[in-house]
């Protein structure tokens, strides 16, 4: 009988948790380096968080003369102005710093239109005041924090505190790694970036819950198995699902990175990176942290061998940490 195509063998026995010492180092780098990048380099905040005016134009020539456009706009004395190519060679993005009043912001747009004339097509004009931008920063931060707290309560209620700690720590790892990508490549950090981070959190959490659920099932099934071996078994049993899910999503997002255009490039690239780092953290961060949390909580499994007198009691104690 045809049982389908198996891209990954069903009986893999990879010792993932045994490599936790190496994974600690890699995970520490993936957490610390992004924080250093944000501190030293900073994020390239978009108009959503910085405030100001954004004007996207398309010139009639095949290649825009950035020098001429820059000279005309800088001559208006509007404060800090950034002019850069955006996508096609004749697409140009003009960023103007926030003006003191809303009227002055509207006047700045009129002045730009006046100096550029009808030789360009105005494809997009966005204006965000300083008050709105500060509110968006606060709202975006609150959204991420609330999502993390809700996840903590959900995992704690469904499983136990050891699983909740492991899930939150690994998700923080994913978030800092993604923010580090924005800092390293100086991608525009805007509301789409917040949406990408929240999507990555949900996507990565789903994968971790699947593994945690298999760990809970195996805790009831193999009461004498050392915890390290049980975690490896659980990860291997869900490995096919983990890999195939991430690969298919990765392949679905790559066209947006390659040909999706500048408007969604940052979001798509963050999603691709989040898929990769989320798969890594589900295997090499969440499970080892669950092991460490269980041991720190005094709930050690029989890593010392099944013949110890207290083994059965330890098994019952650990199994009680998992709600049915």
Predicted features by range, described:
Residues 1-324:
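A structural signal for conserved, well-ordered secondary-structure elements
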């Amino acid at each position: 009988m045809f049982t389908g195509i198996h891209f990954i063998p069903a009986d893999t026995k990879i010792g993932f948790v045994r490599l936790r010492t190496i994974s600690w180092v890699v995970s520490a780098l993936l957490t610390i380096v992004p924080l250093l990048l944000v501190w030293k380099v900073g994020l390239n905040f978009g108009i959503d968080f910085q405030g100001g005016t954004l004007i996207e134009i398309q010139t009639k020539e095949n290649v825009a003369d950035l020098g001429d456009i820059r000279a005309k706009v800088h001559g208006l004395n509007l404060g800090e102005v950034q002019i850069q190519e955006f996508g096609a060679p004749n697409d140009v993005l003009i960023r103007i710093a926030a003006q003191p009043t809303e009227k002055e912001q509207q006047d700045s747009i009129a002045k730009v239109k006046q100096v550029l004339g009808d030789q360009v097509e105005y494809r997009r004009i966005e204006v965000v005041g300083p008050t709105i931008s500060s509110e968006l920063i606060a709202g975006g931060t609150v959204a991420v924090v609330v999502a993390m707290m809700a996840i903590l309560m959900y995992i704690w209620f469904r499983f136990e505190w050891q699983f909740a700690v492991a899930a939150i720590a690994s998700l923080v790892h994913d978030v800092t790694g993604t923010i580090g990508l924005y800092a390293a490549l100086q991608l525009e950090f805007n509301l789409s970036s917040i949406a990408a981070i929240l999507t990555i959190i949900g996507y990565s959490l789903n994968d971790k819950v699947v593994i945690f659920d298999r760990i809970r099932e195996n805790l009831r099934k193999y009461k004498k198995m050392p915890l390290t071996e049980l975690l490896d078994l659980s990860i291997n049993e869900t490995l096919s699902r983990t890999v195939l899910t991430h690969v298919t999503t990765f392949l679905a997002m790559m066209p947006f990175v390659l040909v999706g255009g500048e408007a969604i490039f940052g979001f798509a690239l963050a999603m691709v990176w989040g898929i990769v780092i989320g798969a890594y953290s589900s295997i090499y961060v969440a499970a080892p942290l669950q092991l460490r949390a269980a041991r720190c909580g005094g709930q050690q499994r029989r890593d010392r061998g099944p013949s110890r007198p207290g083994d059965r009691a330890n098994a019952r104690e650990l199994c009680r940490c998992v709600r049915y």
